[in-house]
Amino acid sequence: MKSLHFNYIAWACVATLACVVLSACSSKDSVVLPEPSQPVNPTPEVETIIPVVTIETEKHADIKDKENYINCSVVINDDGKLYTDGTPFSGTGRIRGRGNSTWTMPKKPYKIKLDSKAKLLGMSTDKEWVLLANYSDRSLLRNTTAFEISRIVGMDWTPRSRNVELYLNNTYLGVYQLTEHVKVSEERCDLDLVDEDATEDADLQADYLMELDFHFDASHQFHTSYASLPLMFKEPEQPNDAQFEYVKSCFNRAEAALYGDSFLDPEVGYSQYIDIESFLKYYIVQELTKNCDGNMRGSCYLALKSDGKVYQPFVWDFDIAFGNANHITWEQGASSTGPDGWYIKTCSPWFNRFFLDPAFVSALKQKWNILKPQFDKLPDFIQEQVNQLKFAIGRNFSSTGSGGAGWSIHGEIWPNYEDRGSYEAEVKFLKNFITARLQWLDEHINAL
């Protein structure tokens, strides 16, 4: 069933705009008035396929920063029954800003912490969620597509997400990506975390989640001894001294083996301390997307498990991947936005050593050729997402005066390479990039 939202102001103007941008839409369904109050600039008598999230902060307080939560109510309507039986979700919780560079952008991302666990739109049952704005990605599909690649590859956990339309304090903010927050839990990143008070050697041999990010702004952090990776404790966030030193020693031991003369030795080499399979999967996702945040510099997470090995548990942050950044030189002579050329292989610590291992290269070829037919279907996957978004896109990129969110499809946005002029052109670029990237990688991986 398709849902309708009604606006008494200038509905004909926006209906005409939606027709121009999205090749026409109309409806004869009955009008549904939004609750609990009429938004200032809701969509007028226009069909919606994706769910609608309505958030109201206490006393309509502004969300000013990433540190301070504000009490809020959250209502989610999936009237189109895309992910649920159509029963609305209604709950309370707290909301704050999130992100690094993305928080400085006009379209803000948010972190939500519900008062009670909830299974939102068919995803995991949890309290913590994020609303990704994807402001720099005018296709609004790069994170979604990368998560699909992660699912195909078989990462231990792929964050689930849903495209939604967001109303905040009666103002329509456009298309957002409701996504599972990065955390350790049975339904997300499933790790057996170290006990809070563990200090003995046997007890320290448990699981830890680390964040690798050049911002290096955590309370407990260190650089590794060889590659100088900036590692911060994610969970536990506040390790005791014994836990801190144990984790640091394990990473330095792994790097000593990886960068040592005997790194290929099956008994003392790097394979004793680094899980090759998980890094292989991670590599394929990051190389295929040509993600400038994927070269072990930021938005990367590593797990140290009880077996003493370092694992790649999941992937995150792809809004400027797939040729969407103009500030990275992938390699000498290669375009920063083009689909050709290695990136992770040549420009990432650790991986430049992995590729000196014939066993790693052989495993890569085998896995790539098994997965390639599924990768070839990615343009079709993207089109399916576009079909779901088609009515919402017109509202996201139309003016607030005509009922839209006011985000422009034109003009310069950091770090985009160019203004492609239309949403259709943005989608076409993404599809073409993936097709060409697959062709280049298929040829060059098999030639290794």
Regions found by a protein language model. Name each.
Residues 2-13:
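Bacterial N-terminal signal peptides that target proteins for export
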Residues 19-47:
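Bacterial Sec-dependent N-terminal signal peptides
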Residues 40-98:
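Hydrophobic alpha-helical membrane-insertion signals
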Residues 65-67, 122-125, 142-143, 176-178, ...:
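Short, solvent-exposed loop/turn and secondary-structure capping segments
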Residues 72-133:
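Conserved oxyanion/phosphate-binding beta-strand-loop segments in alpha/beta enzyme cores
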Residues 101, 105, 232-296, 300-448:
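Middle-to-C-terminal accessory/interaction subdomains
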Residues 118-119, 133-134, 155-159, 171-284:
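Internal "kinase-insert"/substrate-recognition segments embedded within catalytic cores
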Residues 135-156:
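A conserved alpha-helical element in kinase catalytic cores
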